[in-house]
Structures are given as structure tokens and as C-alpha cells.
Amino acid sequence: MTHPDRANVNPGSPPLRETLSQLRLRELLLEVQDRIEQIVEGRDRLDGLIDAILAITSGLKLDATLRAIVHTAAELVDARYGALGVRGYDHRLVEFVYEGIDEETRHLIGSLPEGRGVLGALIEEPKPIRLDDISRHPASVGFPLHHPPMRTFLGVPVRIRDEVFGNLYLTEKADGQPFSDDDEVLVQALAAAAGIAVDNARLFEESRTREAWIEATRDIGTQMLAGADPAMVFRLIAEEALTLMAGAATLVAVPLDDEAPACEVDDLVIVEVAGEISPAVKQMTVAVSGTSIGGVFHDRTPRRFDRLDLAVDGPVEPGPALVLPLRAADTVAGVLVALRSADEQPFSDKQLDMMAAFADQAALAWRLATAQRQMREVEILTDRDRIARDLHDHVIQRLFAVGLTLQGAAPRARVPAVRESIYSSIDDLQEIIQEIRSAIFDLHAGPSRATGLRHRLDKVIDQLAIPALHTTVQYTGPLSVVDTVLANHAEAVLREAVSNAVRHANATSLAINVSVEDDVRVEVVDDGVGISGDITESGLRNLRQRADDAGGEFTVENMPTGGTLLRWSAPLR
């Protein structure tokens, strides 16, 4: 018997139950397809994250690592612009690595971000920030002129253990959509790997720098053990420090009187410079009171500065600086200054500690060289005294005996010519004895000869320099080895140079440096109007002749910044 309802169903149409089953199957297939697409997309993004992590951890150079982090982060989330801001010790941005902005636009924008606005919010509170419209954030301060428009934003801190190294900034997702939760998770994972990569790169650079520091210290020590003059130490310190820090310039300032106690030093003089700095800075004086350099010298404490209160000329504008005392036992030999250009980041704590240790080791080498020089001088003086005693006790006495014998024999000579020859020989013996006595006197006067030269030069300055002319004098090296002839030359050179500065240059300051190494050097720098050709040919001809007579060199030139630089040198005899 057929059911009445079933009899009314159209035999050609599918049953209702079958239709519903097909609909559910279609929905299930679509859901499965979506899930598969999500799985594939997730796998692709995970593969992209792994590739990004491998890319940023493959190198050990810090600059290259920072750029790799920015590039891979932008690629990972399809961001048009990316940047990494490095935080300094005072939470300011000290370095800003960017991608997506061409150099022409970068030049039009001007200075790099300093950490204001939304960037500053991430610096003050280092946690992820994701914005659909950056302009709507309460901390937003807008963009500078010529800056490309940016709307979507994703910022994530980069940490090295408990330290926030910097922040990773990404803007303008390529499809115009806002950054998603998945984007944030991926960038956070990348930032974690970036912290490890940066830490490894920093450790590698620190190890290389420490190796260079050890090598530089060894080089200085080797030079000192080889008998280098203490004046050479400061030149080595400046050159090695410049190489270590890869900075713009270095300089060394020491007391005007290296024998005065540190508490009695009022001024320091810059005796050595290296790098991109004007040679005119050499011999510049720096007051101990009221200056950064003087404060470090007085306190014997290494310090760093964002900008040094010292006007120095050079091709680059000086910026961050390290000021390091050259400490040796209970003395301070001077101050070492390392300068970076104004557009470079400040020095770090680790760099300060490392360079302070280098300065201490260098000062110890200077102390060793000074002690060796003093010991050599004592040995020389001891030998002089011994030779003088031998000459007096043996040679002169024997010559006297010979002379007395000849005096007794002369009257008995019958031939007049022989008698005259004997008397002539007696006179020669008297002259020889007198010359030996003079030599003995010079040998005994050896310790005071340096003092005599210094006294003679100081006397010249006192006689010729006028009160309105600010004059500084620096003596370096063993003046005790300068003989009388060279001392006379040095006095004449200084007299002529100071006289010209007073009479012709209209100078207000005069810097004098007298040094003794393998030769005697006299340098005189003034800030006057320069020297004309006629004065050079007439008034300075004598100095050129003195240099020729002594086998040395003489130059005089106008400096680009104004004033005159006079150099005279002659080899030691």
C-alpha cells in the first residue's frame, strides 16, 4: 500500500535529505579548503620567519646585522618602510637604520628622527604598538616636510637579555591593509632573534677591539723597551688610540711643566694630534680650571661627553668625545682625548672602560720610558765623573811631569833651535792641559747644561715677549744631550722668531715648543697676520743659514687659519 504523501513527490527531483547532505558537504569542503589555505599560508610565513632569522644571524659585523634586521623585517610582513632605532645611554636615539626611503628624499627630510612622537612612546614604554592610523595616536607629532605619507604602523622592541637595545619600526603594509595579529607575532619572534644576533655581533666586535687594544699596548711597550724617548710615547698614544676607536681625531694634552705636581698645574698644552684635525691645534693651551679636559686631569676620572668644550679646527665637526687621564702610579702625565664627528653616535660604557684601561697602560709605558731615560742619564753622568777623575788624576799629572822634565832640560840644550823647540812643546803641553781642564769642567757641568739651555731660552722670552702677547712654552726630551753649538743655534732661532712675532706679526698669542729626540727642534706658532716675503728673505735668512751650517732644516709658512708657523731643526752631534 502506497503512502499518500510519498505518492505526491516528483520522481525526477532529488530527495530533500540528499539535498541537505550535499549542502553540508559543500560547506565542509569550503571550510576544509580555507583551513588548507591557512595552513599553507601559515607554513609559508613560518618558512619566511625561519629564512629571516637565518639571514640576520649569518653575519658578525654589527652594521651589516642591523641593516639585515630592517630588510628582513620589512619583507616578512610586506612593509614598504622599515627602520631600527638604537637607544643610547640616556634613552635617546643614537643611530637610525632605515629602508624604503631613497637618498634624495632622505636629504630633503633633513636630520634623522630623535625619538619624539610615537617613536618616543615606544622608547619610554618598550612594548609592541600596532596602529591602523599613526596620526590618531595621542603621542603623534606628525612628519617633517618632504617625508613620505605613512598610516599603518607596527613597532616592536629589540631586547638583549634585560637590556632594550632599540626598537624595530614598520609602516605601510603593501596591500594597504593594517598590520594583523599574525604580523605582530612574527615581528616579535624576529625581534627576539635580532637581539641574539646583535649581541653576537657586539661581542665579536668587542673581542676584535680588545685584541687591537692588546696589540696597541704591546707596541707601545716594545717601543719603550727599545729605548724610545718619552716624548715619542705621546705620539704613539695618539696614533694607536685613533686606530682603536676608528674615530675622527685624537689629541694628547700634558702640563706645561712636566715636573710640577698635578695640584699646581694651571694649564695643559696639546703636544700631539692625530686624525682629521688641524695641525694648528698642536701647542694650543687648555686651562685646567673650568674645562672638561682640565676637570678630568684634576679628578683623574675618565669621562665621556656628547660634545667637548674645545674649539678645534678640522675637516669634520667634532662631536662625542672620550676624555681619559694618563694615570701612572701617583702621577697624571696628561690627558688623552678621542673625538668622533658630530653625526656619529656617542661612546658606550664598554668603550669608555676599555679606552681608560688603554690610557692607564700607555701612561705606565710613559713612566717606564721616563725612568729608563733618567737611569741612562745617571749612567752617562757617572761615566763623565769617572772620565773626569781619570783625566785629572792620571793624564794631567803625567802631562805635568813631562812638562817639568822638559822645562828642566830646555836650559841645558846647546843648540838654539832645539831649545826653542822644547819651549814650544812646553807651551803646547800647557794648552793641552788647559783643554783637558775645560773638558773636565764640561763633563762635571753636564747636569746643568740642560738647565742652562732652558734658562737661556726662558731669558730670551722674558727679554722680548711683551705683556700683551700670551706666550706658552713647552720643553720635551733630554735637553742634557744638546751641546754648546746647538744650544747657541737654538737660542738665536728663538730670539729671531719671538722678535718677528712681536715686531711684525701683531700677534696676541705665541706657542713655543722646543723638543729633543734624534734632533733639536724649535717650533714657534703665532696667531698674527702672517709673514710677508720680504721679511722672510731678510729677517730670517740668518736662521736658514744656521740650519744649513748644522745640517738641519728650516721652514716658515703662513697657516690657513691665520698666523705663522716656524720650524727649525738640526741633528744632534
Curated annotation (Swiss-Prot):
Compartments it resides in: Cytoplasm
Q: What happens when the gene is disrupted?
A: Cells lacking this gene show no changes in gene induction following hypoxia, or exposure to NO or CO. Another publication shows a slightly reduced response to CO. Cells lacking both this gene and DevS (DosS) have no response to hypoxia, or exposure to NO or CO showing both proteins are required for the hypoxic, NO and CO responses. 30% decreased induction of the DevR (DosR) regulon during anaerobic growth, 50% decreased induction of the DevR regulon upon exposure to NO during aerobic growth.
Fetch the InterPro entries from UniProt. Answer: GAF (IPR003018), GAF-like_dom_sf (IPR029016), HATPase_C_sf (IPR036890), Sensor_HK_TwoCompSys (IPR050482), Sig_transdc_His_kin_sub3_dim/P (IPR011712)
What molecular function terms (GO) are annotated for this protein? ATP binding; calcium ion binding; carbon monoxide binding; heme binding; magnesium ion binding; nitric oxide binding; oxygen binding; oxygen sensor activity
Q: Which Pfam families match?
A: GAF_2, GAF_3, HATPase_c, HisKA_3
Provide the Gene Ontology terms for cellular component: cytoplasm; plasma membrane
User: What catalytic reaction does the record list?
Assistant: ATP + protein L-histidine = ADP + protein N-phospho-L-histidine
Looking at the record, the residues that make up the GAF domain are 61-198, 229-366
Obligatory cofactor(s):
Mg(2+); heme
Q: GO biological process: what's one of them?
A: detection of hypoxia
Q: What is its EC number?
A: 2.7.13.3
TM region positions:
none
The record's keywords, sorted A to Z, are: Cytoplasm, Heme, Iron, Kinase, Magnesium, Metal-binding, Phosphoprotein, Repeat, Transferase, Two-component regulatory system
Residues covered by region (ATP-binding domain): 451-573
Query: What exactly does this protein do?
Result: Interacts with the two-component regulatory system DevR/DevS (DosR/DosS) involved in onset of the dormancy response. Required for full induction of the DevR (DosR) regulon; required during early adaptation to anaerobiosis, to start induction of the DevR regulon. May act as a direct hypoxia/oxygen sensor. O(2) acts as a switch, with the Fe(2+)-O(2)-bound protein inactive in autophosphorylation. Autophosphorylates under anaerobic but not aerobic conditions, binding of NO or CO has no effect on autophosphorylation. Binds a number of gases; O(2), NO, CO. May be a secondary sensor for CO.
Report the protein name in the record.
Oxygen sensor histidine kinase response regulator DosT
**Origin species:** Mycobacterium tuberculosis (strain ATCC 25618 / H37Rv)
